Regions:
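Transmembrane alpha-helices and immediately adjacent membrane-cytoplasm interface residues
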Residues: 1-4, 8-10
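Terminal membrane-proximal soluble interaction domains of membrane-associated proteins
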Residues: 14-102
Length: 102
């Protein structure tokens, strides 16, 4: 499944959107890819989360998964293919402006 996820345009499970989150601390931005959405219940409280895969450049098959509250995820206005190029190039291949969708 990870190989399919890294091939934009393939049918089935794949990265859905390019997003930006504060990671590893507030103020530092990290590019990731939405893999799923889920709810987490703690006691009587249920909150919506987004599964975000954070690839390690230059090898995107190495990375890790974080579950981020929906309110902390910012969707970037770019295709998954453009996002992969950005990550694989270490940030070299970019237009110089990342626009978040409102």
């Amino acid at each position: 499944d990870i190989i399919n996820a890294l091939q934009p345009g393939k049918k089935g499970r794949s990265f859905r959107q390019v997003v930006m989150i504060d990671y590893p601390r507030p103020g530092l931005k990290t590019i990731g890819f939405v893999t799923n959405e889920l709810d987490i219940q703690e006691g009587s409280n249920t909150e919506g989360y987004i599964s975000v895969y954070l690839p390690n450049p230059p090898n995107p098959t190495s990375g890790f998964l974080v579950l981020v509250p929906r309110s902390d995820v910012h969707v970037i206005d770019m295709s998954v293919e453009e996002g992969l190029k950005l990550v694989l190039s270490g940030g070299i291949v970019t237009s110089g402006l990342l626009k978040c969708k409102v």
